[in-house]
Amino acid sequence: MTPWFLYLIRTADNKLYTGITTDVERRYQQHQSGKGAKALRGKGELTLAFSAPVGDRSLALRAEYRVKQLTKRQKERLVAEGAGFAKLLSSLQTPEIKSD
């Protein structure tokens, strides 16, 4: 199973873009060359601000959604300290179903 990553890219005007991928460097290069998300095209210099492995695609999609719901301040804390990322991931883990 290929691991998935959550990443945040900072634009020249200090906005944070959140995405997921299986290859952070490849995806960052796509964004840099204008072949990534439309939201980042024409935004000037892009900087990879944060990336972390999250597990499978399903978990990555849920983590991306949750991070996109955070305030700018919370995202900045995540970038600066990784604040709460482990807790966020653990809250997204689905509990195992036990059979009798």
UniProtKB/Swiss-Prot annotation:
Q: Where is the GIY-YIG domain?
A: 2-77
Q: What residue intervals traverse the membrane?
A: none
Alphabetical list of InterPro entries matching this protein: GIY-YIG_endonuc, GIY-YIG_endonuc_sf, UPF0213_domain, UPF0213_GIY-YIG_endonuc
Q: Which CDD domains match?
A: GIY-YIG_UPF0213 (cd10456)
The protein's matches in Pfam families, at most eight in alphabetical order, are given as: GIY-YIG
Enumerate the PROSITE patterns for this protein. GIY_YIG
Instruction: Give the record's family classification.
Output: Belongs to the UPF0213 family.
User: Any idea what this protein is called?
Assistant: UPF0213 protein YhbQ
**Gene name linked to the record:** yhbQ
